[in-house]
A protein has these predicted regions:
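Residue-level signature of catalytic and energy-coupling elements of molecular machines
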Residues: 55, 90, 123, 188, ...
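Residue-level detector of high-confidence beta-strand sites
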Residues: 109-111
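A short acidic Gly-Thr/Ser loop motif
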Residues: 88-95, 101-104, 113-117, 210-213
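Glycine-rich phosphate-binding loops at beta-strand->alpha-helix junctions
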Residues: 43, 143-145, 200-225
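Feature representing long, continuous alpha-helical segments
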Residues: 121, 175, 179-186, 190, ...
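Phosphate/pyrophosphate-binding loops at sites that engage ATP/ADP/AMP, CoA/4′-phosphopantetheine
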Residues: 185, 189-205
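Nucleotide/phosphate-binding catalytic cleft detector across ATP-hydrolyzing
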Residues: 1-88, 105-106, 116, 129-176, ...
Length: 273
């Protein structure tokens, strides 16, 4: 474990019982020697302490911690995805989180240190606008593929304190967004190659979720960079009828996943009595 980190979760991947290998669940087997491979998730002690302190200040108590892409995966994945093998790519504000499932087992997790906030800052510095303007342009006019942006379309940005208005090319905006999103997807490809899983192994492809996944043409860029099928993951797999439509947006995947985690833990505890 890295210095300054602590274990958040220990997830079993597979078991061995004597000469029997790759056993997902050892219950029912008999033998002399039992072994296992585990996926250990760690986190920075200071960050964990700050999270606990923030929760306690709100009058609540932290029961458990869960890695963001695992929470999102719980909200957007179904049993078929788990069986087929998928990569969950959760594009948040500060980071992009990756969780890879193969043969029903969590095989890999990673945190890529770039997210939607980096794109906003790139637009701010590249086009010389305010951060609020950069965020608004990204949401309203942004595209992850510059080839899909209209060459002769411009956005008018009001001038500051009497200065003349500024004309921003939609094409230039898309070029900036594509550069950063391509970098993020290159990291995703790198991690998948490192663990030996690609489009031939992950038949379910890539599931994009999180607030950053709402960028136009992101699916096409992801498929181009990674060579894998991609789709947007909506957190509606486990929502009951009559739910608020707002909750089905990808930006709420982590929140829905955490609620599911809490509910499932309560149900297990309740049924044990």
């Amino acid at each position: 474990i890295p210095a300054g980190d602590q274990i958040i979760d220990v997830i079993p991947q597979e078991f061995t019982v004597d000469n029997f290998q790759n056993i997902p669940n050892p219950i029912g087997y008999s033998g002399v020697k039992v072994g296992a491979n585990f996926h250990i998730i760690t986190g920075d002690k200071t960050a964990i302490r700050n999270i606990n302190r923030a929760v306690e200040k709100s009058g609540l108590k932290t029961k458990d911690l869960m890695l963001q892409p695992l929470a999102s995966a719980a909200a957007v994945m179904c049993d078929q995805d788990l069986e087929a093998g998928v990569a969950i790519v959760d594009i948040g504000g500060g980071t992009t989180d990756l969780a890879v499932f193969y043969e029903g087992i969590l095989k890999h997790t990673a945190v890529i240190p770039f997210g939607g906030e980096n794109i906003t800052n790139d637009i701010k510095s590249g086009l010389g606008v305010l951060k609020t303007q950069a965020e608004q342009m990204k949401i309203q006019f942004g595209s992850a593929l510059s080839d899909e942006a209209r060459t002769n379309t411009f956005i008018t940005i009001p001038g500051l304190r009497g200065m003349a208005a500024k004309e921003i090319s939609v094409k230039n905006l898309a070029n900036i967004i594509q550069a950063r999103m391509s970098e993020i997807m290159d990291f995703v490809s790198y991690h998948l190659k490192q663990i030996g899983l690609d489009n031939r192994m992950l038949n379910g492809g890539i599931i994009l979720t999180g607030g950053g996944s709402q960028l136009k043409h992101l699916i096409q860029l992801t498929e181009y960079v990674t060579g894998m099928n991609a789709r947007i993951g909506f957190p509606n797999e486990h929502l009951c009828g009559g739910h608020t439509e707002e909750l089905t947006k990808p930006m709420y995947s982590t929140c829905i996943g955490l609620i599911l985690k809490g509910y499932n833990d309560f149900e297990i505890k309740f049924n044990s009595f």
